[in-house]
């Protein structure tokens, strides 16, 4: 996805929630998750994106997305998801919960599974 945006002359900033958490664990923030939320919000303020696309960003809290919406309500939020969501796929309950977790805060969702498999 990033490569497609870059090839179409868009400025892309990739943020890895896992890397930020891994590199920022401390006594004050044992899990690194608080630091992640703060870094995302500060980056959002500085970068001023037109769109945020989440891919397997399970560690990004809903409250962080809500704060970003408060800062700039015109930014579009989307997510993409490649893992299977059908009942017969591996770990379908967990995958379905992951895709639905932030769906009320998003403008769009891109799936590789037929959306009817979500039973929403």
Predicted feature locations:
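Extended catalytic core of nucleotide-activated donor transferases of GT-like folds
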Residues: 1-120
